[in-house]
From Swiss-Prot:
Residue spans of biased composition, Low complexity class: 164-179
Alphabetic keyword roster: 2Fe-2S, 4Fe-4S, Cytoplasm, Iron, Iron-sulfur, Metal-binding, Mitochondrion
UniProt GO MF annotations: 2 iron, 2 sulfur cluster binding; 4 iron, 4 sulfur cluster binding; electron transfer activity; metal ion binding
Protein localization: Cytoplasm; Mitochondrion intermembrane space
Region called Fe-S binding site A, residue ranges: 224-240
Linker: annotated segments: 145-214
Annotated region described as N-terminal SAM-like domain, given as residue ranges: 17-144
PANTHER family from the UniProt entry: ANAMORSIN
Residue ranges of the region described as Disordered: 1-20, 153-179
Record family assignment: Belongs to the anamorsin family.
Protein name per UniProt: Fe-S cluster assembly protein DRE2
Cofactor: [2Fe-2S] cluster; [4Fe-4S] cluster
Amino acid sequence: MSPATVTIDTTPDFSNGGAPHSTLLLAPPAMAAQQDAMAAALTDAAPLGSRPELYMLDRLAAGLTNLAPAAYDLVLVLASGADPLLSRRDVFAKIADAMKPGAKLRSRDGSPLDAAIAKEAILAGLVESAEGAYEKPAEEVAAVPLKFLKKKNKGEGGGPVQSPAAATQPTAPAPAAAAKSLPNGVVMVDLNDDFDVSDDEMIDEDELMTEEDLMRPIQQPPECAPKPGKKRRACKDCTCGLAERLEAQDKARRDKADKQLQEKAATPFKLASEDLNELDFTVQGKTGSCGSCALGDAFRCADCPYIGLPAFKPGEEVTILNNVAQL
């Protein structure tokens, strides 16, 4: 006689009835050489029903590692202080997308996160909780009903109410498109309708001030008044007309100076004999007006005719041969 078939149930007798708790560990590049520290972090983050995963921040920033969207319930940062990779906005956006709604981000040791990291967490849409962690809020989609105004001037039969004067006049046939009833929620808009905005309400800005207003003297503010002993200047955002007035005065002063220079340029300038003898050092006892022409270029005036010549003694004859001074 063959034995009866025996069925063995391999399913666990006790089950928590929920998905395993996923934990994401983010380690800086400097922690790659510390194998013991990473093993301890994985051990601490692996309680009953937890599934920890360790990723390096440099590989995540370089795009060599991709995180699954909405896959982690807890994100632990193993960096103790400020980390430049974790402060990058593109890296933090990937971390925020990988968090489930209601997931939390905090440091492993429970210390507050760096200010730069906390700023990026808030910009990524996370909300700071009372424990110092940053939680991803759950998003809800809600429908907003739109309310439309009821049509006015309706009779009991649903037709428009006509005035007695309009009832005696023959009504024009309505267009075929307007005769059709519109479904609920559909509103017909006339593009030629100006929505009861009359042209009389438009104000011409040129008519705001009359000729009498323009002829009134400008009231100068006290802060624009010239201070004693100082030159009068206009403000950067001058509105009292002082800037235009000073600019006109400067233009008139420049035009006058240019005119005087043109008049002097048209008249040739001639030196008298006594002016030439004053600078002629071949004459014994004659010196220049400054008395420093013979000392060299360092002591000569800007318009001295001896610029470029070496120093010489007063009374010594100076000749130029082949562009070379001969003393």
